[in-house]
Amino acid sequence: GSYLVSGRVAYPGVIVSLLGKPGLKSTQMTFYDLNAKVNRVLSDRDRIYFSVYSGGDHTVFDRLVQGYGMDWGNATATLRWNHVVNEKVYANCSAIFSNYYYRYKSLRDGLRYLWKSNMQSYQLKYDLEYAPSNTLRIKSGSALHVFSTMPGSVGKYGDMSNVVPYRMERRKMLDAALYGEVQWRFWSDFQLDAGVRVSTLSASGSVLYKSHTFFLAEPRAELSWRLDHNSRLSVSFNQASQNLHMLSNSSVGLPSDMWLPVNSILKPITMRQF
């Protein structure tokens, strides 16, 4: 087995605060990233991989534009088991977690508040690949994805605040999917890639809308012809669905983006590409 650990930290706020300008003396800016990867050989056919990542940005600009602060952060962890069934079949089983958040702090007198938003993702995946020959490769798998987001909440930041706390309702979505794909090379210069992913999306309800379940099919196909070593001619079709929607306000000069899963009102968006 082997392992890898790395990280970095930056404090540019120290340099900014030393510039001598009164409006910059209380400035805080900190950035960090941490990575760790470990893999271990269990047997000739089995190997385990584990990786984690954590990163964050912290900024405070006191007195500048009356004072504000912003924080971003992201953390992920992945555990993957690779198993070789035989010389033609191998499988991967993965468990994945991710968490993203951001916070905005207003430091104005009388309007000191903290805005928070976060979203979490939990995934289980099983992928199987079968290569019966040098010209044929078959892939299949399943996935279970639980998505949870708290679009936003606002609360008092300190004692000198007139803000009325408010918290938006947490939204959840369950995505269960199966997929299959075939890659076939024939007549030496032709290759066909075709597959389909089918899924059911179960969205939780609220006081504004009912819980709802969507059935989605996402087929794709590509036929390519290799003209020579540097040229290829291909024709393709692809259909994909977007199950998360970002709501943003371009007129507000702060990170106001909110991610929402689909529901009975905000339906999935389908894209078809030729």
Report residues per predicted region:
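Outer-membrane beta-barrel "beta-signal"
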Residues: 83, 222-224
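Face-selective signature of the C-terminal outer-membrane beta-barrel domain
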Residues: 39-57, 71-208
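Surface-exposed extracellular loop regions of Gram-negative outer-membrane beta-barrel proteins
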Residues: 101, 148-159, 202, 225, ...
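Predominantly transmembrane beta-strands of Gram-negative outer membrane beta-barrel pores used
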Residues: 1-41, 49-53
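One-face residue pattern on beta-strands with alternating periodicity enriched for small/polar residues
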Residues: 179, 218-222
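Short sequence motifs at beta-strands and strand-loop junctions characteristic
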Residues: 26-30, 60, 69-73, 116-120, ...
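Short, solvent-exposed turn/loop segments enriched in Gly/Ser/Thr/Pro and often Arg
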Residues: 8, 53-54, 143-144, 237-241
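Short glycine-enriched, charge-decorated loop/helix-capping segments at active-site entrances
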Residues: 20-25, 65-68, 110-113, 208-211
